[in-house]
Swiss-Prot record:
Location relative to the cell: Secreted; Bacterial flagellum
Disulfide bond entries: none
Keywords from the UniProt entry: Bacterial flagellum, Secreted
Record NCBIfam families: PRK08026.1
Protein known as: Flagellin
Source species: Salmonella rubislaw
GO cellular component, one term: bacterial-type flagellum
Length: 493
């Protein structure tokens, strides 16, 4: 080896090794201080990518576990409300059993019904107001989807049902129901317009004359399809036939040609003539009289067919259909396609098996309330359904009878609540299982990620100690290497 002083190769070699040991010492100190084997992608590019995916899964599963706990909370909130509904139903059933006892007076039944109504109202309140984080859990049918995994589609559904007195089938539960009715009708043979005779022999329109003594014969006929009235016009020398009849407010009647009785060329399509003021009067109540009498309604006196209307809560006038007026009373009626009038009645069976008939009477404030008239007394029609009228003079004092299968209805409601509670209990157990599984998965993934990216302190401490020793040795050797050129100077002495 040549002896030179310009280039100190040994010093350069020593410096290079010293830099390596210093880099190794820095890496060891970084890993020991951070606790991570992979502090950047340069430490392990593949390991860094794998560990990053593990981190995403771990965070997703951890949040999914929290979601599952929220699902348990929702189910518990809902079940708590259902438990209170169940308590109310149990009390309603107890009251229904009490009401079935024939020793109860009417006032007893009224008191029992009052508490039943309050209990059902409380069920409706619980249903409408129970909520979890703004979600009303019993107010409507709903499915809540809970994310219990780190990936799409990893969900558990909570099926919620609307639970209130109506969905439970108890909104009409009434221990005061003592009657049973069914709808039928007493039919009037027809009614006639009593003032339709035309008292002049000519129609002035278009200077056309019918000739003879024209008159509207027979009853006015109502066509349900077109909503129009028709009449036969006879006694003319020009054109007998069927005409559409329209009566104006001023008392004028207009006859219009129809396909069944066309008006030919040279004859006007319409002809107008003054007639007497018309009314829908003289309803033929011959066949209905028996029903009126049976219902305790005197059929004598003035009778007419009138058109009814009423005003709803918004002030809007609503068509109330037809009614037959008997004296000062009005009874609901229906106009048939053939022009006849049917009085709407209610047929009921007395406890002795006798068939009875009641009329649907229009009464109450401003004629807005439809009632059933029986034996000279009136009862709200909406309260009549499901009743069994007693053939006694005063229905208010009629002996109480058992409501039709009230306990069966309540038991069905209890079963409906129990079914939903069972579903909620099952889904809670499912959430608990999911949470346990999520915890196990998170633990395993965390361990796997740790093996990839965490520092092995035993290894890193050894690496640091080795690097420190190499640093010390390198520094000492570098000092010696720097002295080598000095040896060359001895040759110059």
């Amino acid at each position: 080896m040549a002896q030179v002083i310009n280039t100190n190769s040994l010093s350069l070699l020593t410096q290079n090794n010293l830099n390596k040991s210093q880099s190794a010492l820095g890496t060891a100190i970084e890993r020991l201080s951070s606790g991570l084997r992979i502090n950047s992608a340069k430490d392990d590019a593949a390991g860094q990518a794998i560990a990053n995916r593990f981190t995403a899964n771990i965070k997703g599963l951890t949040q999914a576990s929290r979601n599952a706990n929220d699902g348990i909370s929702i189910a518990q909130t809902t079940e708590g409300a259902l438990n209170e509904i169940n308590n109310n139903l149990q009390r309603v059933r107890e009251l229904a059993v009490q009401s079935a006892n024939s020793t109860n007076s009417q006032s007893d039944l009224d008191s029992i019904q009052a508490e039943i109504t309050q209990r059902l109202n409380e069920i409706d309140r619980v249903s409408g107001q129970t909520q979890f984080n703004g979600v009303k859990v019993l107010a409507q049918d709903n499915t809540l989807t809970i994310q219990v995994g780190a990936n799409d589609g990893e969900t558990i559904d909570i099926d919620l049902k609307q639970i209130n007195s109506q969905t439970l089938g108890l909104d009409t539960l009434n221990v005061q129901q003592k009657y049973k009715v069914s709808d039928t009708a007493a039919t009037v043979t027809g009614y006639t317009d009593s003032a339709t005779a035309i008292d002049k022999s000519t129609f002035a329109a278009s200077a056309t004359t019918l000739g003879g003594t024209p008159a509207i014969t027979g009853d006015l006929k109502f066509d349900d399809t077109t909503g129009k009235y028709y009449a036969d016009v006879s006694g003319t020398t020009a054109k007998d036939g069927v005409y559409e009849v329209t009566v104006a407010a001023d008392g004028k009647v207009t006859l219009t040609g129809t396909p069944t009785g066309p008006i030919t060329a040279g004859f006007p399509s319409t002809a107008t003539k003054d007639v007497k003021q018309t009314q829908q009067e003289n309803a033929d109540l011959t066949e209905a009289k028996a029903a009126l009498t049976a219902a305790g309604v005197a059929a004598a006196g003035h009778r007419s067919v009138v058109k009814m209307s009423y005003t709803d809560n918004n002030g809007k006038t609503i068509d109330g259909g037809l009614a037959v007026k008997v004296g000062d009373d009005y009874y609901s009626a229906t106009q048939n396609k053939d022009g006849s009038i049917s009085i709407n009645t209610t047929k009921y069976t007395a406890d002795n098996g006798t068939s009875k008939t009641a009329l649907n009477k229009l009464g109450g404030a401003d004629g807005k309330t439809e009632v059933v008239s029986i034996g000279g007394k009136t009862y709200a029609a909406s309260k009549a359904e499901g009743h069994n009228f007693k053939a006694q003079p005063d229905l208010a004092e009629a002996a109480a009878t058992t409501t039709e299968n009230p306990l069966q209805k309540i038991d069905a409601a209890l079963a409906q609540v129990d079914t939903l509670r069972s579903d909620l209990g099952a889904v809670q157990n499912r959430f608990n299982s999911a949470i346990t599984n999520l915890g196990n998965t998170v633990n395993n993934l965390t361990s796997a990620r740790s093996r990839i990216e965490d520092s092995d302190y035993a290894t890193e401490v050894s690496n640091m100690s080795r690097a420190q020793i190499l640093q010390q040795a390198g520094t000492s050797v570098l000092a010696q290497a720097n002295q080598v050129p000095q040896n060359v100077l001895s040759l110059l002495r």
